Regions:
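Beta-strand initiation motifs
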Residues: 12, 24, 121-124
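Short loop/turn motifs at secondary-structure junctions
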Residues: 13, 45-46, 92, 160, ...
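Residue-level signal for inorganic ion chemistry
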Residues: 14, 29, 51-54, 187
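Active-site catalytic loop in hydrolytic enzyme cores
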Residues: 73-78, 104-185, 189-199
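Cys-nucleophile CN-hydrolase/nitrilase-fold catalytic domain and related Cys-dependent amidase chemistry
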Residues: 34-121, 126-127, 193-199
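Extreme N-terminal starter segment of soluble prokaryotic enzymes
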Residues: 10-16
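N-terminal phosphate-binding loop and adjacent alpha-helix
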Residues: 18-36
């Protein structure tokens, strides 16, 4: 794993995990993430930022099942924190970005969270709610979740960052807004459907 230089001369150890979740099974997929935390703990140099896909702990195509698997950002952060502490031998700080179905203010969203683990409590640095929901072809996301209403940069240990979820990145306005807000790093989570003859 090579350092990814950015932030004007700083570098960060970044890990990107391809993660194919068991559809609709938050607890099972959380357990698999614990195995991933243990693998990361054994790496040297150890990653400082772990990125997982959109809807990493439930799968993407849930349609009406979103309500059953949606969690609050606080619940997800606590679950990740407890799992991380139980899965590693030395709980050094680890920043994690992953997509999840979020329940917020009695509405459901396709969201991404940036959370710092390893301290006495998890630190939720930002939650981004997907703004551009696809409603074409095989996609009908707007029937099951609400649109997010803002996109902005936020502070991390590495500088200003921003989160986008899948189709948000197809619209140049989102990148322009976060760049104007000082983002030096944009983390995009996505779960495009598989294509081709592979299982």
């Amino acid at each position: 794993m090579n350092p990814s230089p950015y932030l004007y001369g700083m570098s960060i150890q970044l890990a990107i995990a391809q993660f194919s979740p068991k559809k609709g099974d938050y607890r099972f997929n959380l357990g698999r993430l614990g195995d991933l935390f243990a693998q990361i703990d054994a790496l040297e140099p150890r990653p400082q930022l772990l990125c997982l896909p959109e809807s990493a702990l439930t799968g993407y195509f849930l349609e009406g099942g979103v309500r059953e698997v949606a969690v609050t950002a606080g619940t997800l952060a606590r679950d990740l924190h407890e799992l991380y502490r139980a899965s590693v031998t030395s709980p050094r700080m680890l920043d994690v970005v992953l997509g999840f179905y979020e329940e917020w203010q009695n509405k459901l969203y396709n969201s991404a969270i940036y959370v710092t683990l390893g301290g006495s409590e998890p630190i939720v640095r930002h939650v981004h709610r997907k703004m551009f929901l696809p409603t074409y072809g095989m996609f009908d996301e707007e029937r099951f979740v609400e649109r997010g209403r803002e996109v902005r940069a936020f502070d991390t240990p590495w500088g200003r960052a921003a989160l986008l979820v899948c189709e948000d990145a197809w619209h140049s306005i989102t990148g322009a807004i976060v760049a104007l807000d000082g983002a030096q790093l944009i983390v995009l989570v996505a779960a495009p459907p598989a294509r081709g003859p592979w299982p």
